[in-house]
Structures are given as structure tokens and as C-alpha cells.
Amino acid sequence: MRSMTLFILFVSIIALLFLLINLVFAPHIPYQEKNSEFECGFHSFHQTRFPFDSPIAAQAICFVILDLEIFTMFPYVGSLGINTFYSLVVILGFMFVVSAGFVFELGKGALKIDSKQNMGGDSTHLELKNLKDISSLNLCPPSAFKN
């Protein structure tokens, strides 16, 4: 327990040292706009309110969920030598649920983002109406399989 106490003491001293260095060497240039409240009549130099694109937020949430799913699979990969058949079934079931969720999101159109590049007459976003559309995606051209 003594080493843990020394570690906590060392980390606390380093944190206080960085705080003191910041207080001593940081520039302090106060002016009226910096000290006033934003809600009480702050006159900004430019527009501070920007429109928020909700499909991008939905993709960000999907990305965070994907990261959590990958972190959930890390212990399985780390213990490949001692895994049993049951653990293989569990991880395959988990991957099936993740894949089914991805196909569902793709089918609902949650992964499409309309950008200025595809706002012309030709829409290039990917939206599936049913599972039969997956075969018509042509994700890999036939010429890729020729030698």
C-alpha cells in the first residue's frame, strides 16, 4: 500500500506544479467583452448561432455505439488461447446482433447524409428499402475478380 500512497502523492504534486506554472506564465488580458455575461447582452463580433445538422449527430451516436461494441469484443480477442466453444457462440451471436442493427439502420436511411456534392440531380446516398436491395448494391465490380 506504501507504493500506492507514493504514487498518489507524486501525481498530486505534478498536478499542482502544472497548475502553478499555468497561473504564473499564462497571459492575463482582461477586457470588457471577456468579463461580461453572454446571456445578458453580449455583443458578439460575428454570428454565434449555427444550424445543427441532426443526421451528423445520429452518425456520431452510431460511431460511439460501434466503438463500445469493439471494446466489448477486446476481451475475447485477448484470450484467444483459452476460449471455449461457448465463448465463440456468444461472440458470434453478439456480432450477428451488431450486423443486424447495422442493416436496420441502413434500411431506415439513418446513415445517409445529404451533402452539397450529391444535391444535384443524381443522388448517391445509400438507402435500402428492403433486404433484396442489398444484392443490387454492386459493392465490388465483376472486373475485380478477373486475373
Swiss-Prot record:
Q: Which UniProt keywords apply?
A: Electron transport, Membrane, Mitochondrion, NAD, Respiratory chain, Translocase, Transmembrane, Transmembrane helix, Transport, Ubiquinone
* Entry keyword annotation includes NADP: no
Documented EC number(s): 7.1.1.2
Task: Kindly state which reaction or reactions the protein catalyses.
Answer: a ubiquinone + NADH + 5 H(+)(in) = a ubiquinol + NAD(+) + 4 H(+)(out)
Q: Where in the cell is it found?
A: Mitochondrion membrane
Domain of life the protein comes from: Eukaryota
* GO CC annotation terms, alphabetical: mitochondrial membrane; respiratory chain complex I
Q: Give me the segments passing through the membrane.
A: 6-26, 60-80, 84-104
Q: What class of enzyme is it?
A: translocase
Q: What are the GO MF terms of this UniProt record?
A: NADH dehydrogenase (ubiquinone) activity
What Gene3D superfamilies does UniProt report for this protein, alphabetically? NADH:ubiquinone/plastoquinone oxidoreductase, chain 3
The Swiss-Prot or TrEMBL record describes its family as follows: Belongs to the complex I subunit 3 family.
The task this protein performs is described as: Core subunit of the mitochondrial membrane respiratory chain NADH dehydrogenase (Complex I) that is believed to belong to the minimal assembly required for catalysis. Complex I functions in the transfer of electrons from NADH to the respiratory chain. The immediate electron acceptor for the enzyme is believed to be ubiquinone.
Q: List the PANTHER family hit by this protein, alphabetically.
A: NADH-UBIQUINONE OXIDOREDUCTASE CHAIN 3
- By what name is this protein known? NADH-ubiquinone oxidoreductase chain 3
Native organism is: Neurospora crassa (strain ATCC 24698 / 74-OR23-1A / CBS 708.71 / DSM 1257 / FGSC 987)
